[in-house]
Amino acid sequence: MIQAILVFNNHGKPRLVRFYQRFPEEIQQQIVRETFHLVLKRDDNICNFLEGGSLIGGSDYKLIYRHYATLYFVFCVDSSESELGILDLIQVFVETLDKCFENVCELDLIFHMDKVHYILQEVVMGGMVLETNMNEIVAQIEAQNRLEKSEGGLSAAPARAVSAVKNINLPEIPRNINIGDLNIKVPNLSQFV
């Protein structure tokens, strides 16, 4: 089972942190720091697996990582997971990010955190691998994007509110709405029309 997924840059700044086991925040920060120091001091031509038993609390935990440009992608897993399978999973996750963001970079992980988390949830949920087919993952992401566009998102909410008021066909827009003891002053909507 996957215990945690960590993505941090060359300077140790976390860009994505997802724990699938409950830890206090101080312990999570310590795990991220120690993982960064363990991974950073390894040479690029050394094996991408290392023991992480003392980090997460058991002797059967491993850290499996890949280094892409300025980012380290680290999966903390227990002994039941295949190291090569997790390396392939990291590759699938990164290539999916690359397809969704058209040449993904660190800034995409910073400014599109919600989308990155959604992509990760399509791949891994609750520490279990859900999907490894990149085309299927991208199709789900595109379906989600179409749904968001059809709903208009939050940015279109003010325009929808104004058009809803216009569609009421009131002869005159009320200036005050009284509901019991509650008195609501209606703003001048003519400036939005």
Swiss-Prot record:
- Keywords tagged on the record: Cytoplasmic vesicle, Golgi apparatus, Membrane, Protein transport, Transport
Q: Which Pfam families match?
A: Clat_adaptor_s (PF01217)
How the protein sits in the membrane? Answer: Peripheral membrane protein
| Record localization | Golgi apparatus; Cytoplasmic vesicle membrane
- Give the tissue specificity: Present in all adult tissues examined.
GO BP field: anterograde axonal transport; anterograde synaptic vesicle transport; clathrin-coated vesicle cargo loading, AP-3-mediated; Golgi to vacuole transport; intracellular protein transport; intracellular transport; melanosome assembly; platelet dense granule organization
Any single Gene Ontology cellular-component annotation: Golgi apparatus
Q: Which domain of life is it from?
A: Eukaryota
Keyword presence, Lyase = no
Q: InterPro entries, per this entry?
A: AP_complex_ssu (IPR016635), AP_mu_sigma_su (IPR022775), APS3 (IPR027155), Clathrin_sm-chain_CS (IPR000804), Longin-like_dom_sf (IPR011012)
Its predominant location is Golgi
Is Protein transport one of the keywords UniProt gives this record?
Answer: yes
Q: Which residues form a coiled coil?
A: none
The text of the family note is: Belongs to the adaptor complexes small subunit family.
Give the protein's biological function. Part of the AP-3 complex, an adaptor-related complex which is not clathrin-associated. The complex is associated with the Golgi region as well as more peripheral structures. It facilitates the budding of vesicles from the Golgi membrane and may be directly involved in trafficking to lysosomes. In concert with the BLOC-1 complex, AP-3 is required to target cargos into vesicles assembled at cell bodies for delivery into neurites and nerve terminals.
The record's note on quaternary structure and interaction partners says: Adaptor protein complex 3 (AP-3) is a heterotetramer composed of two large adaptins (delta-type subunit AP3D1 and beta-type subunit AP3B1 or AP3B2), a medium adaptin (mu-type subunit AP3M1 or AP3M2) and a small adaptin (sigma-type subunit APS1 or AP3S2). Interacts with AGAP1. AP-3 associates with the BLOC-1 complex.
What name appears for this protein in its UniProt entry?
AP-3 complex subunit sigma-2
**Organism placement in taxonomy:** Eukaryota, Metazoa, Chordata, Craniata, Vertebrata
